[in-house]
Swiss-Prot record:
GO function terms (MF aspect): cytokine activity; growth factor activity; morphogen activity
Broad class of the protein's primary localization: secreted
SUPFAM superfamilies, per database record: Cystine-knot cytokines
UniProt feature, compositional bias: Basic residues: 320-329
Gene Ontology CC, one term: extracellular space
Propeptide segments, given as residue ranges: 24-348
Coiled-coil segments on the chain, per record: none
Protein name listed in UniProt: Bone morphogenetic protein 3
Segments passing through the bilayer: none
Signal peptide extent: 1-23
Record gene name: bmp3
Positions annotated with a glycan in the UniProt record: 107, 449
CDD domains reported for this sequence: TGF_beta_BMP3
Organism whose genome encodes this protein: Xenopus laevis
UniProt subunit comment: Homodimer. Can form heterodimers with ADMP, BMP-2-I and/or BMP-2-II, and DERRIERE.
Length: 458
C-alpha cells in the first residue's frame, strides 16, 4: 500500500490540473458561445431576451472590447476571427422562402459603404447532432455497448440575391466532415465567410440565403432546421470619426434628434394647459410663485389681471390698497440684481476653480431619449472642460504656443477684441456602445473621443 501512495498522489495532481484546464476553457467560452464572463456581462443580460444566443455572444464581445482587449486570453482560433476594428454587426437568420429554396435568409442591408469588412463568421448549431447516438448499423463503427457516435458530412451553401430576385450567385459552398472524435467539440460551430460577404456587398446583393444539409454514411440526406444560425461581421467604419457620427449612427435610424412639440388637436387647442402657464415666467424673467395669474383663451395669451373674487363691489380706497399690494407682489417675483444677490453669486463662483480644468459630467442615455435602443452602457462619465485661460497661464494648463502668444497680445491690449484662449479637451478616450439598429440587430461600435481625460488651453 505504501508503494502505491506516490502513484495515488500523482494521479490526484493530474486530475486537479485537468480540472483547472477545463475551467479555463469554460471561462474563455470555448465550450458554449452563449456563456458570459464577468459581472458586467451578467448585469447587462437582463436587457436581452432569454436564450438569445446572438445577443449573449454580442454581450461577451462588448465586455471584451470594454475591458481593453480581452482577446489575448482567447484561443488562437477565435483570435483569427476577431480582427481589430471599431464595429461588430450581428445578423439574425430569418425563415427562408420556399420559392428561393433557402432554409434561412440574412438581411445585410445595414452594412454601410463606409464600413470596410475585415472578417465575417457564420455560426450554426450542431448540439443535437453531436450529442445524439443511434444503434450502430455496422459492427465496425460500434462501441462495446453497441452504440455509435454520429459520423456525417455537412453541406453549407450560401447564395446572394436581391430581395425581389431568386438566388443568383452561389458565393460559397462548404463541405465539412464530422467524425466520431469531434463529438466533444463546441455545440455551436462557426465558419469563416469573409469572402462570401465581401462578394455579396460587391454585387450589391445584400441578402444571403443559407442551406445546411447533413449526409450520413448510408447516403441519407436531411435538412437541419434547429436553432437559427447567425452571422457576425467585423468591420472598420471610416466615418465613425466624422462630426456627429454618434448621432447619425446611434440616433439616425430611429427618430430625428429634435424637441418634440405637443401635437394639439382642435379640441386640445381649446383646452387650457398648465404647461403653457409655466413658460410665461421664463419669458418675462419672473420667479414663479405659488399661484399663477396667467390664463389662456382661444385667441392666445391674455394680459395679466387680478384674481377674481365673489365679494361685493369695493370703493376707490380699497382698490388703491389692492393695487399697492399687487405691485409689491409683482416686484417680489421679479429677479432683483441687488448687492446681496451679486455677493452670493460671486461667493459661489469663488468656491469653484476658476482656471481651466476638467469638470464632472455624467450622461444618462435615458435623459436624452436613447435608452430604448442602447443596451449598454446605460450611462457614462463624459466630463467637460471649463475655466479661464488668462495671462500668465501656468504650465499645468499645458497651453500651446499659439495660446501663449494670444494671451500675451490680449493682456497688452494692442489689438482690440482679442479673446482669451479657450479651455478645451486635450486627451479623450473611446467608448464602446452596444445598441440595436433599425432591423433590431445587435451592433457594437467603439466611438472615439467620448470621454474627456484632460483639459488644456488652446
Amino acid at each position: 500500500m505504501a508503494e502505491c501512495r506516490p502513484w495515488l498522489v500523482l494521479w490526484v495532481g493530474c486530475c486537479g490540473c485537468l480540472c483547472l484546464a477545463l475551467g479555463e476553457l469554460l471561462n474563455d467560452g470555448l465550450l458554449a458561445v452563449g456563456m458570459g464572463t464577468g459581472d458586467a456581462a451578467r448585469q447587462e443580460e437582463a436587457a436581452l431576451p432569454l436564450g438569445d444566443t446572438v445577443s449573449e455572444h454580442m454581450l461577451r464581445l462588448y465586455d471584451k472590447y470594454r475591458s481593453g482587449g480581452g482577446r489575448a486570453k482567447e484561443s488562437l482560433r477565435y483570435r483569427q476571427a476577431l480582427p481589430d476594428g471599431n464595429t461588430v454587426r450581428s445578423f439574425r437568420a430569418m425563415n427562408g422562402d420556399e420559392h428561393k429554396k433557402c432554409h434561412y435568409m440574412f438581411n445585410l442591408t445595414s452594412l454601410t459603404s463606409s464600413e470596410n469588412i475585415l472578417s465575417a463568421t457564420l455560426h450554426y448549431y450542431l448540439g443535437d447532432l453531436l450529442n445524439s447516438s443511434h444503434r450502430c448499423p455496422h459492427s465496425l463503427f460500434c462501441t462495446q455497448h453497441g452504440h455509435a457516435k454520429p459520423e456525417f458530412t455537412l453541406y453549407l451553401t450560401l447564395w446572394s440575391f436581391n430581395a425581389l430576385q431568386n438566388p443568383t450567385h452561389v458565393i460559397s459552398n462548404f463541405l465539412i466532415n464530422v467524425s466520431a472524435s469531434q463529438r466533444d467539440h463546441p455545440l455551436w460551430q462557426w465558419k469563416d465567410i469573409t469572402q462570401a460577404v465581401r462578394k455579396a456587398k460587391e454585387y450589391g446583393e445584400a441578402v444571403l440565403g443559407f442551406n445546411l444539409t447533413i449526409e450520413y454514411p448510408n447516403h441519407r440526406s436531411i435538412d437541419i432546421l434547429g436553432l437559427k444560425p447567425y452571422i457576425l461581421v467585423y468591420a472598420n467604419d471610416s466615418a465613425i470619426s466624422e462630426p456627429d457620427s454618434v448621432v447619425s449612427s446611434l440616433h439616425g435610424p430611429h427618430t430625428p434628434l429634435a424637441l418634440k412639440p405637443n401635437r394639439k388637436t382642435e379640441k386640445a387647442e381649446q383646452r387650457k394647459k398648465r404647461s403653457t402657464e409655466i413658460l410665461l415666467p421664463l419669458q418675462n424673467n419672473e420667479l414663479p410663485g405659488a399661484e399663477y395669474q396667467y390664463s389662456v383663451d382661444e385667441e392666445g395669451w391674455e394680459e395679466r389681471k387680478p384674481y377674481k373674487n365673489l365679494q361685493g363691489r369695493q370703493n376707490e380706497k380699497d382698490k388703491n390698497k389692492k393695487k399697492l399690494r399687487k405691485g409689491s407682489r409683482q416686484k417680489s417675483q421679479t429677479l432683483q440684481f441687488d448687492e446681496q444677490t451679486l455677493k452670493k453669486a460671486r461667493r459661489k463662483q469663488w468656491n469653484e476653480p476658476r482656471n481651466c480644468a476638467r469638470r464632472y459630467l455624467k450622461v444618462d442615455f435615458a435623459d436624452i431619449g436613447w435608452s430604448e435602443w442602447i443596451i449598454s452602457p446605460k450611462s457614462f462619465d463624459a466630463y467637460y472642460c471649463s475655466g479661464a485661460c488668462q495671462f500668465p497661464m501656468p504650465k499645468s494648463l499645458k497651453p500651446s504656443n499659439h495660446a501663449t502668444i494670444q494671451s500675451i497680445v490680449r493682456a497688452v491690449g494692442v489689438v482690440p477684441g482679442i479673446p482669451e484662449p479657450c479651455c478645451v479637451p486635450e486627451k479623450m478616450s473611446s467608448l464602446s456602445i452596444l445598441f440595436l439598429d433599425e432591423n433590431k440587430n445587435v451592433v457594437l461600435k467603439v466611438y472615439p473621443n467620448m470621454t474627456v481625460e484632460s483639459c488644456a488651453c488652446r
